[in-house]
């Protein structure tokens, strides 16, 4: 925002309604009321126009701005003077240019504008100024003070800047006329009665009429400065005063009297608003005022002429003068009160807003400038830092490299020495061990005690040697143990001998014998000097330089000689060897010499020989070098000089390669060392963190145990003792309903209540002392109990009627502790609770009283719903708490909840909250507000809704105070990061209850999400706790490790206060058993081909490596591969359906639009036409062109019909009868069994009609065609009527021999080929050949409607079609159905001959065989056998699938087998689910119920079925467990058998193995059992993607991969991570799990608008599997073949499937 005014120069709001002066020029428009624009800090405006909407109303002027109007000094100018008292004295001129961009000169220079009285800026008027000439009696505003202009004026009168909020500029207003005082005064009578000023053309300036001269005014300049007006005064309009103030210097002359003749004629006046508008819009002339030019001079302005007005009559003038006098004498109104205070306040608000916007914009620009400056400064510093680094590197790099190289060389030498020393010591240990064993063996065999003691001493000596050597190997420098030192003999004469130190070993005899060596020891410096000299000599030999031999008189030799002499002189004289005559000494002596002769002498000999050969080889090399050096001067030729450059280059290349290789090796070694250091540091840190986590875990578990101790113990039934339930015995205290004073107080804590620790960082978990941790845990537990009680009290305290009720019946202010509570079943509950359900009710009631939330985790089918309903009934019946209760359940169970509550507790009203947004809005009208008490007469008590709707309408649910919130299937909130979990956690409810049959589904984190939800104060921020559970328990299930029993016990102690779980087999004895069976199936030939082709197209090793890198695209590809393999296992038709085959049809086919508008029955016309058509003229097809059809143009046809068919027709009945009577031509009819009427009718029928009539007549002489020799000949002959023997027609009916008879052996003998064809079943097999093409018959084409109608009547003749195909018409079928008639009498055999092939019928269209459809899948073939057995046994089946596409295929199979079924999946509507389940439960004829595991596995009761079949198992075993418990639940009296179809040797076996591991996790955590019976030696949890890749491999490949991974681990590498490159550094996005891909659209069973899953979309593999499997797949990346590789853009489902199926890259 720039501080320029928001209005354009021509805005009418910038002008007063009654101007005081006229502008001096068209291009310079000054406005007397512009001081309000000075409130914004002036800045350079942008060059664009403002919005047109910023224009103000033209009818009202606005109050001046109270804000200061000063400009900041430019270029160090002086600050502006203080604000003056009259705000209207400061003006701001606007430029008339479009986008003025002028520089700002110094604003306070006096040379820019003159301050004389002629300047228009020196006119002083108020915000509602009046003309300068007026009556004395009128009120007037205070005079203006002359002020200096604040803005410089440009050459055209515009200021030096323009507003960024201006509109498009327009020409300035023309100069205005100066009228008479009465004409200019809006309140004067003349102004009221005068007509509107006539408008002139834009170019001509109007002038005053001559009869009205302009009044002369004298303006006296005011004093130059006045005191500034306070801000409070400037904020209000100036006060109204009557008369002129005493300080006014303005002198106004009285107007001259106006003659009556000069007055205008009285005419009809317009309205006040119109007059005011006209007065504002009309140009007015004024006196010639000076106009400032470009150089500051002033030019007078000429007054323009105006047209003369009409004069009034004398009578009119007298009337006007009289009225004027009355008006002048009347009381004047307060003209200074404009009545626009609201506009003024609005303007003030807008001005402040503009100032704030300007400040905000300036702040943004200031931040941007500061940011740019800091960026530039940072770049400068960075450049200087880099330069300094380069200078330092250039100065010190060489020395550092040399130092590092020298250090590395020295370290390598020391390492080699250490290794040699280590090997020698290990060899010594091994030899001494052998000696020790040998000595012990001899000692055991020795009979003499002395000899045995000798051997034992040798063994002891060897043992000491071994210990000392091992100590040296381990680098231990501690002194020998006291037991290893030989004890000193006591000195009886005076203590012990003190000349030997106990901590020092005795000197060796062998060493003392060698003490007299002639060779002196060399110091380390001497050895290094000799090495340096040797290296220098070798370097000189290599460079062909003379050896730097020491001179003969070298002082070093003299020094060495002196040192040797001094050493010899210092050697002590050896003492004479004393001889010993003992036998042991002699044996040791002889043994020493034998060892020397056998070992040391050959060793020394070898050393000497090797030294001699080395010396000779060195001398030989030296001689060769010397001879070469001596011959060099002879071999120097021109050729050798030319080769110098080549040799130098080769040498340089070799040196470069050597140093590169050397640097690479050094770098690798350095990296390896750094890696080892980092790993060791990580290991140490991991150990420290493990100890810390252990203490933190101990703290958290202790805290929860204390909480459990404080709130009491959970109720436990007698039948649950054997189930391993975590419940313990309760206390003896019970709740006594009706006694308000009965309370049970908790014991006081020994810890300080005020020491609650909410931040774990404040606790020192590294300290060894755990006293502080125990105290903090106890304090936190007690605070948690206290907070739960206070929260319950606070909730009850807000309900005033409820509090009064509590005082009479039950005191909720002092909740009791948890114990054995004997609560009877509520009377309003119509059902009878079982024993364990009643105990569950007791537990839930006590949780409610304590204000504690809980998890009811009974196994599915034990009645969690009825227990929850009984709690609500108990609260309503005993404590008169009628709600509101909130029940949230999956969408598929909403109707079940509504029905159960209405059925079991009719007194409780249920509000079903679901439907569209409009319906839910209507339902919310029934909600009571939060402060209204719910009673029995309330609109509703329980609201039932779904998880999805709760999230959508969470803002409405959060406004209601819920007494009890029940979450059914609580695993829906297992993720603490989901919006569903967060929204539900924010609901205002007294208690929460979670119902779930599977508290643990995939990992322990989901259990902790539920614990967080029910107790957020106790289980807050326990990430380490959750990680501990996931790491220890799941690794226990995977690696078969031993879980700490104490930790498991304490885990169960944590779950005890919050979770109650019972198992069916312990609490429900009458419930039938559940038997699970795994049915293994084999792959068929087609499935094996698909499976092998898929596996050959992918490399398992590449998948493992990509999985190790962690690329998101590769992980998605891997998941897609798993899906394709599972499709192959289910059915190969999921990839490619068998196609319907037919010959190529050559013809035209009609096209139609969508069939959606057609309704149920679609009338398909015969529209197929041949490409060849025979065109006929319209004349031939019409009646006029037909000879036999009568018409207006065909008289011959009428003649024929009249004479040939009637008058001259011989087949008339009269003629036939006369002929028969006279034995004429028709006398044969008596031998043809034909009457006269039949002969007449047949004469008028065609061939087809006569054939149809003969179809129903039986041949009574057919038995005469065959000779029978059995006993029935007599009966047969009797069946033939005597008069039929003379029937000449039937007797002479000649026909083929094969058609003589239709039954018996004769028929078989006459039709051998046909009978054989039928008996062999050749007519029911698929035809092996079919024609390549077919075409409809050639038709006649005519453009007339008559021909088309006849063609349609012929083709679609109902009677003809019925006779040929024996298909009744639609009307006949409808009548048969309506009247419920037997269709047999109305259906005759067709007249068409029987087709040769029953499969092909009369066409050559081949439909895929359903038998082959069944046998193509191993699973489906096994299922077919299983269903046949189950159907015969009277069982009913629940059939679960993972893919909705497979359900579609299964529907075709069940239709083929004529099994009645019903279907429920994710696409089934909510209202249809209830009806489908009810049909299956009530109709026993329905054999199979097809369900998807996710949609049909929750909340529905299907106890009518006793068999569950999983066609393909889910990834999560809990989902399958929930699905099978749809049948195995309360109400099931039969044994439930569960069949699981698993394809042997495929990915499904490994998926099942993984599911067993998850089940083991649940069993360990919930029941506390130990792992066993299942092999959990699988891969680690961190490599989940690698595990999935391992599923695709067979056993041999898996073994090979594990072996390679083990080898890589031994080398210290990560298997498959070497080829990762930069991909390893990429962060993974949100994982697209296999569950999401499989159950897309159907997994969310509470989603009403779920669509069928698209994961099982069939993929065309006609081209995929035709490619040879050995074709290598081109790899992606640079330098890896010609394959482009797929891009990293987001791919569609089709592209991903193509990429998986091997269609190559996705080249466009």
Swiss-Prot record:
Region (Disordered): 1-312, 410-584, 626-648, 718-750, 1643-1708
Catalyses which reaction(s): ATP + H2O = ADP + phosphate + H(+)
Record field: compositional bias (Basic residues): 507-522, 1675-1691
Residue span, DBINO domain: 592-717
Helicase ATP-binding domain mapped to chain residues: 845-1017
EC nos: 3.6.4.-, 3.6.4.12
Keywords for the protein's UniProt record, in alphabetical order: Activator, ATP-binding, Coiled coil, DNA damage, DNA repair, DNA-binding, Hydrolase, Nucleotide-binding, Nucleus, Transcription, Transcription regulation
One Pfam family linked to the record: SNF2-rel_dom
A Gene Ontology term for the protein's cellular component: chromosome, telomeric region
Residue ranges of domain Helicase C-terminal in the record: 1422-1582
Regions of compositional bias (Polar residues) in chain numbering: 24-37, 87-102, 111-129, 1658-1672
Gene Ontology molecular function, alphabetical: ATP binding; ATP hydrolysis activity; ATP-dependent chromatin remodeler activity; DNA binding; histone binding
Gene Ontology biological process terms in this record: CENP-A containing chromatin assembly; DNA repair; positive regulation of transcription by RNA polymerase II; regulation of TOR signaling; subtelomeric heterochromatin formation; telomere maintenance via recombination; transcription by RNA polymerase II
SS bonds (residue pairs): none
Ranges of biased composition (kind: Low complexity): 206-219
Motif annotated as DEAQ box, chain positions: 968-971
Residues bound to ATP: 858-865
Keyword Nucleus appears in the UniProt entry: yes
Family: Belongs to the SNF2/RAD54 helicase family.
Function: ATPase component of the INO80 complex which remodels chromatin by shifting nucleosomes and is involved in DNA repair.
Assembly, per entry: Component of the INO80 chromatin-remodeling complex.
Protein name: Chromatin-remodeling ATPase INO80
Species this protein is from: Neosartorya fischeri (strain ATCC 1020 / DSM 3700 / CBS 544.65 / FGSC A1164 / JCM 1740 / NRRL 181 / WB 181)
Gene transcribed to yield this protein: ino80
């Amino acid at each position: 925002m720039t501080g320029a005014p928001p209005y354009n120069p021509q805005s009418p709001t910038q002008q007063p309604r009654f101007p005081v002066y006229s502008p001096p020029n068209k291009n310079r428009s000054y406005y007397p009321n512009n001081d309000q624009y000075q409130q914004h800090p002036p800045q350079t405006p942008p060059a664009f126009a403002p919005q047109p909407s910023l224009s103000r109303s033209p009818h009202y002027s606005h109050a001046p701005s109270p804000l200061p109007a000063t400009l900041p000094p430019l270029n160090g100018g002086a600050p502006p003077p203080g604000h003056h008292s009259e705000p209207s004295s400061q003006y701001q001129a606007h430029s008339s240019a479009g986008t003025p961009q002028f520089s700002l000169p110094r604003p306070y220079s006096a040379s820019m504008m003159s301050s004389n009285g002629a300047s228009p800026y020196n006119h002083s008027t108020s915000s509602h100024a009046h003309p300068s000439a007026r009556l004395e009696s009128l009120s007037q505003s205070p005079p203006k003070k002359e002020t200096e202009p604040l803005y410089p004026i440009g050459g055209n009168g515009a200021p030096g800047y323009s507003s960024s909020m201006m509109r498009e500029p327009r020409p300035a207003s023309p100069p205005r006329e100066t009228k008479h005082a009465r004409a200019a005064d809006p309140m004067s009578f003349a102004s009221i009665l005068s007509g509107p000023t006539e408008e002139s053309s834009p170019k001509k300036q109007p002038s005053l009429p001559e009869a009205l001269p302009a009044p002369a005014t004298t303006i006296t300049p005011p004093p130059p400065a006045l005191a500034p007006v306070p801000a409070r005064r400037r904020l209000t309009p100036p006060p109204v005063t009557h008369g002129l103030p005493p300080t006014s210097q303005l002198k106004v002359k009285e107007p001259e009297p106006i003659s009556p003749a000069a007055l205008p004629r009285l005419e009809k006046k317009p309205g006040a608003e119109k007059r005011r508008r006209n007065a504002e819009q009309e140009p007015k002339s004024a006196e010639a005022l000076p106009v400032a030019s470009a150089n500051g001079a002033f030019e007078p302005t000429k007054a323009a002429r105006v047209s003369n007005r009409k004069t009034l009559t004398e009578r009119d003038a007298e009337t006007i003068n009289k009225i004027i006098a009355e008006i002048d004498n009347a009381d004047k109104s307060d003209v200074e009160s404009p009545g626009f205070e609201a506009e003024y306040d609005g303007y003030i608000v807008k001005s402040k807003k503009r100032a704030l916007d300007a400040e905000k914009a300036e702040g943004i620009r200031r931040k941007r400038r500061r940011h740019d400056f800091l960026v530039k400064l940072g770049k400068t510093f960075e450049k200087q830092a880099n330069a300094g680094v380069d200078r330092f590197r250039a100065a010190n790099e060489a020395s550092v490299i040399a130092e590092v190289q020298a250090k590395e060389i020295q370290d390598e030498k020391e390492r080699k020495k250490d290794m040699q020393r280590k090997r020698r010591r290990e060899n010594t240990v091994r030899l001494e061990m052998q000696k020790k064993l040998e000595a012990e063996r001899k000692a055991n065999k020795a009979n003499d005690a002395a000899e045995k003691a000798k051997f034992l001493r040798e063994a002891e000596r060897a043992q000491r040697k071994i210990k000392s050597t091992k100590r040296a190997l381990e680098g231990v420098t501690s002194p020998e143990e006291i037991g290893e030192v030989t004890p000193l003999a006591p000195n009886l004469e005076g203590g012990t001998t003190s000349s030997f130190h106990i901590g020092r070993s005795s000197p060796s005899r062998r060493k003392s014998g060698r003490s007299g060596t002639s060779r002196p020891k060399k110091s380390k410096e001497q050895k290094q000097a000799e090495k340096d000299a040797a290296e220098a000599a070798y370097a000189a030999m290599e460079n062909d330089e003379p050896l730097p031999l020491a001179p003969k008189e070298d002082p070093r030799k003299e020094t060495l000689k002196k040192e040797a002499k001094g050493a010899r002189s210092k050697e002590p004289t050896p003492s004479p060897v004393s001889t010993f005559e003992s036998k042991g000494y002699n044996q040791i002596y002889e043994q020493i010499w034998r060892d020397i002769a056998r070992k040391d002498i050959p060793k020394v000999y070898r050393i000497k020989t090797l030294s001699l050969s080395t010396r000779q080889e060195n001398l030989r090399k030296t001689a060769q070098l010397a001879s070469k050096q001596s011959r060099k001067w002879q071999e120097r030729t021109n050729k050798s000089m030319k080769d110098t450059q080549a040799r130098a280059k080769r040498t340089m290349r070799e040196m470069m390669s050597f140093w590169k290789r050397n640097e690479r090796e050094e770098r690798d070694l350095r990296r390896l060392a750094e890696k080892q250091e980092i790993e060791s540091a990580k290991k140490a840190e991991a150990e420290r963190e493990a100890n810390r986590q252990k203490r933190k875990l101990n703290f958290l578990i202790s805290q929860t145990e204390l909480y459990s101790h404080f709130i009491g113990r959970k109720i436990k039934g007698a039948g649950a003792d054997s189930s391993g339930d975590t419940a313990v015995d309760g206390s003896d205290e019970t709740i006594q309903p009706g006694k308000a004073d009965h309370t049970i107080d908790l014991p006081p804590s020994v810890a300080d209540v005020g020491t609650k620790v909410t931040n774990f960082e404040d606790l020192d978990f590294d300290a060894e002392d755990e006293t502080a941790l125990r105290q903090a845990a106890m304090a936190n537990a007690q605070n948690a109990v206290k907070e739960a009680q206070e929260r319950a009290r606070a909730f009850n305290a807000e309900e005033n009627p409820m509090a009064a009720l509590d005082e009479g019946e039950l005191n909720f202010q002092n909740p009791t502790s948890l114990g054995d509570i004997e609560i009877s079943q509520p009377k309003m509950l119509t059902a009878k609770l079982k024993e364990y359900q009643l105990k569950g009710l007791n537990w839930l009631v006590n949780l409610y009283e304590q204000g504690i939330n809980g998890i009811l985790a009974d196994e599915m089918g034990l009645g969690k719903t009825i227990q929850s309903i009984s709690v609500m009934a108990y609260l309503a019946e005993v404590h008169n708490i009628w709600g509101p209760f909130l029940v949230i359940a999956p969408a598929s169970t909403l109707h079940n909840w509504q029905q159960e509550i209405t059925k079991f507790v009719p007194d409780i009203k249920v509000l079903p909250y679901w439907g569209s947004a409009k319906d839910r809005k209507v339902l919310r009208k029934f909600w009571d507000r939060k402060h209204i008490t719910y009673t029995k007469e309330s609109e509703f008590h329980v609201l039932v809704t779904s998880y999805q709707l709760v999230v959508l309408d969470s803002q409405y649910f959060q406004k209601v105070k819920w007494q009890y919130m029940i979450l059914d299937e609580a695993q829906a909130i297992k993720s603490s990061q989901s919006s569903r979990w967060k929204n539900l956690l924010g609901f205002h409810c007294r208690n929460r209850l979670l119902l779930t049959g599977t508290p643990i589904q995939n990992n322990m984190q989901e259990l902790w999400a539920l614990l967080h939800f029910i107790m957020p104060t106790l289980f807050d921020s326990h990430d380490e706790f959750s990680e501990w559970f996931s790491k220890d328990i799941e690794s226990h299930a995977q690696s078969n490790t031993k879980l700490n029993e104490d930790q498991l016990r304490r885990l169960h102690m944590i779950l005890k206060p919050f979770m109650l779980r019972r198992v069916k087999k312990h609490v429900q004895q009458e419930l039938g058993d559940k038997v699970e069976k795994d049915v293994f199936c084999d792959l068929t030939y087609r499935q094996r081909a698909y499976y092998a082709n898929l596996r050959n197209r992918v490399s398992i090793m590449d998948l493992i490596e990509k999985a190790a890198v962690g690329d998101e695209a590769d992980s998605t590809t891997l998941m897609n591969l798993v899906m394709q393999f599972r499709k192959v296992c289910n059915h190969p038709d999921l990839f490619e359906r068998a196609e319907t085959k037919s010959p190529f049809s050559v013809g035209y086919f009609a096209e139609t639009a969508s069939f959606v508008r057609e309704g149920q029955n679609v009338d398909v016309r015969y529209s197929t036409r041949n490409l060849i058509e025979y065109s006929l003229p319209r004349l031939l097809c019409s009646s006029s062109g037909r000879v036999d059809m009568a018409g207006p143009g065909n008289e011959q046809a009428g003649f024929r019909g009249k004479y040939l068919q009637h008058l001259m027709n011989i087949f008339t009945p009269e003629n036939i009868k006369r002929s028969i009577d006279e034995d004429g031509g028709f006398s044969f009819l008596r031998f043809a069994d034909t009457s006269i009427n039949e002969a007449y009718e047949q004469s008028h029928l065609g061939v087809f009609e006569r054939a149809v009539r003969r179809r129903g007549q039986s041949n009574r002489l057919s038995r005469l065609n065959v000779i029978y020799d059995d006993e029935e000949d007599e009966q047969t002959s009797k069946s033939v009527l005597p008069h039929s023997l003379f029937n000449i027609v039937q007797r002479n009916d000649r026909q083929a021999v094969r058609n003589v008879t239709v039954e018996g052996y004769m028929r078989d003998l006459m039709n051998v080929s046909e009978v054989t064809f039928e008996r062999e079943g050749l007519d029911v097999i698929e035809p092996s050949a079919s024609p390549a093409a077919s075409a409809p018959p050639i038709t006649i084409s005519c453009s007339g409607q008559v021909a088309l109608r006849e063609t349609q009547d012929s083709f679609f003749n109902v009677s003809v079609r019925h006779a040929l195909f024996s298909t009744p018409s639609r009307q006949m079928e409808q009548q048969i159905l309506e009247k419920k008639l037997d269709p047999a009498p109305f259906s005759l055999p067709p007249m068409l001959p029987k087709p040769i092939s029953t499969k092909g019928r009369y066409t050559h269209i081949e439909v895929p065989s359903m038998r082959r459809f069944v046998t193509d899948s191993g699973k489906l073939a096994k299922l077919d056998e299983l269903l046949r057995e189950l159907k015969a046994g009277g069982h009913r089946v629940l059939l679960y699938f993972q893919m909705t596409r497979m359900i579609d295929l299964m529907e075709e199979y069940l239709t083929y087998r004529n099994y009645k079924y019903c279907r429920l999946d994710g696409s089934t509507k909510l209202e249809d689910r209830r009806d489908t389940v009810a049909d299956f439960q009530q109709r026993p004829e329905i054999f199979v119920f097809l369900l998807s595991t996710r949609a049909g596995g929750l909340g529905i009761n299907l106890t009518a079925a006793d068999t569950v079949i999983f066609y393909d198992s889910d990834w999560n075993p809990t989902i399958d467990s929930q699905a099978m418990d749809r049948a195995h639940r309360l109400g099931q009296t039969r044994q439930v058998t569960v069949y699981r179809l698993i394809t042997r040797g495929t990915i499904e076996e490994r998926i099942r193995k993984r599911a067993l591991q998850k089940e083991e996790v649940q069993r360990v955590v919930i029941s506390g059992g130990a792992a066993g019976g299942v092999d959990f030696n699988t891969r680690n949890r961190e490599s989940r993607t690698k595990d999935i890749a391992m599923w695709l491999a067979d056993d041999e490949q898996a073994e090979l991969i594990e072996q390679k991974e083990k080898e890589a681990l031994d080398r210290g590498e990560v298997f498959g991570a070497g080829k990762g490159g930069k991909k390893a550094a990429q962060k993974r996005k949100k994982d697209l799990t296999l569950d999401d891909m499989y159950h897309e659209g159907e997994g969310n069973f509470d989603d009403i608008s779920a669509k069928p899953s698209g994961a099982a979309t069939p993929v065309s593999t006609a081209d995929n599997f035709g490619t040879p499997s050995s074709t290598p797949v081109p790899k992606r990346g640079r330098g890896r073949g010609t394959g482009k590789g797929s891009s990293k853009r987001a791919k569609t489902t089709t592209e991903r499937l193509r990429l998986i199926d091997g269609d190559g890259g996705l080249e466009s």
